[in-house]
Amino acid sequence: MLTLKLISEETERVIKGLEKKHFKGAKDAVEKVLETDKRRRDAQQKLDKNKQEANSMSKQIGMLMKDGKTQEAEEVKAKVAVYKENDKLLQTQMAEAEQELTTLLCNIPNIPADEVPEGKDANDNVVVKEGGVIPQLPEDALCHWDLCKKFNLIDFDLGVKITGAGFPIYIGKMARLQRALEAFFLEEARKSGYLEVQPPLVVNQASGYGTGQLPDKEGQMYHAEQDDLYLIPTAEVPVTNIFRDVILDEKDLPVMRCAYSACFRREAGSYGKDVRGLNRLHQFDKVEIVRIDKPEHSHESHKKMLEHVEGLLQKLELPYHILLLCGGDMSFTSSICYDFEVWSAAQKRWLEVSSVSNFGNYQANRLKCRYRHAEDKKIELCHTLNGSALALPRIVAAIIENNQTPEGIRVPRVLVPYCGFEMLDDKNF
């Protein structure tokens, strides 16, 4: 969440940033925060003054008793008792203001970085780079869902029978290709310096709150109510929460972690034509990269993450472009975000396969993820960053469509050592 210091010292900048993100009622929300913080500080000042007066009077009681002025001592005791009652009232007022303040802050999104373009939605995002060659397919080229049926690679209907829409079953060589992609992505992350972790697939409320999924995306997450646990929408949540309530040493930055996980999202099924085949699922596999760094180094960290993801797409021989998201299309928590999209040749459209975001200190403030300066031992909030490297379903869709032949689907050369075959076909064994 945004820091009170930022909101109070740079109020106009915060309001303009929230308006750039098309956050409704930006000015009212900020003013409410400042008003509530003033109530909290006023209660604190009154409480401090009240305690000071009570302590001063308490000292008088002993002196009066010593001088034999019992009645006067009792009168002072009565006044001290009133101060103590006032203490309770002021403490309650302060606690209520603090709780209200926390609620207000956690419902205000991060503000965009200066370089984020103005815009309302995805139509206003800016293409900043393109790469690869778009394949020219014959007119009778098939979309990936038809190819999967033709070569017996993915059974969408069987997934519906067992669970429901958005839970496909991968078969034979396709299951092996899934494993190959996961292994390839993790190995490339390791080569880039990321330490692999294998996180839990369910998290508690504190973890969801720490990375900003809660309360913002509560309706999009699967909730195991009996245990009050949430299925993760991305490995970002458990991996970043490793560093919740942690003070890192400056020498240990940047922290670099990667993780493969299944991801679960209830939002699938509400996007019309986007839901066909692998385009949008309830359950999918993804490799996530996470970096935690000093504020002055986070821009460079973001750049390195973008280069890493771009390198993966180049090695997979997929045509891609990189989009700088406009203010209105950014997530609740991000300060700046780039999306990677690959060309799906049969669908003739771009498919998002990665978002790489810098959150500034927004997540770190919720997580209380800090670091200690080496020289003066000052403690400061870290900056957190993460990105998909990569999400599998749409990568698989693009590989299938772009590399189709009458005999099967050509496997990208970089994956052959990981899967052991060069062609995806119905010869599954």
Located regions from the model:
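TRNA-recognition modules of translation machinery and tRNA-sensing kinases, especially anticodon-binding
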Residues: 27, 130-429
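N-terminal alpha-helical targeting/anchoring segments
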Residues: 1-135, 153, 157
